[in-house]
């Protein structure tokens, strides 16, 4: 069975690579493995293709996330890197939208099914301040937030874009995640 190179408590799983970090923040209640090892399998597949360092961060139900602190806490385990690709799932996407602008090394973010009906003001404010190259909001066509997707047009930042993924709901399949992350990592 595949394993992370480093596991820090139940909070972080790391596959060590080179150059860049892909930092994945799971949805509320998400573990570093994900359902049926989804995150571990995705990281392993993409690591073999790109060789980047992958960090998966759990999202315990009753926790408050400080993304900057989380990244600092794994720095000593991942070595030197040029930039961070941030991937957020559901609540992890909301966290990314609200907090990525505070972290200079995050140049690109993909935010999957961030709930738009919960604290949208935080999503909007953070995304408006994002100084990176791209902040992609992805929504499954059957995700409850998809019907509100046009509210993202109120974010005045040319880096922010959104896309609807046909045939997906709130929980993207492993195959769809790999496809979208492949596209994201190759620009």
List each language-model region with its residue ranges:
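Short beta-strand/loop motif that positions the catalytic acidic residue
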Residues: 130-131, 136-139
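Conserved alpha/beta-hydrolase "acid-adjacent" motif
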Residues: 144-150
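Catalytic active-site module of serine/aspartate enzymes centered on a nucleophile-bearing elbow/loop
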Residues: 176-187
């Amino acid at each position: 069975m595949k394993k992370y190179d480093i596991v820090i408590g139940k909070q972080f799983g790391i596959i060590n690579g080179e150059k860049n970090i892909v930092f994945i923040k799971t949805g509320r209640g998400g573990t570093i493995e994900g359902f049926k090892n989804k995150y571990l399998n995705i990281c392993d597949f993409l690591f073999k293709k790109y060789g980047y360092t992958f960090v998966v961060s759990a999202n315990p139900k009753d926790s408050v996330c400080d993304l900057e602190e989380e990244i600092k806490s794994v720095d000593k385990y991942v070595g030197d890197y040029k930039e961070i690709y941030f991937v957020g799932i559901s609540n992890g996407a909301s966290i990314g939208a609200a907090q990525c602008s505070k972290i200079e090394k995050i140049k690109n973010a993909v935010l999957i099914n961030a709930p738009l009906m919960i604290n949208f003001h935080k999503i909007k404010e953070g995304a408006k301040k994002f100084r990176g190259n791209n902040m992609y909001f992805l929504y499954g066509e059957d995700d409850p937030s998809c019907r509100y997707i046009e509210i993202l047009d109120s974010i005045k930042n040319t880096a922010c874009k959104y896309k609807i993924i046909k045939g997906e709901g709130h929980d993207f399949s492993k195959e769809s995640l790999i496809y979208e992350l492949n596209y994201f990592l190759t620009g």
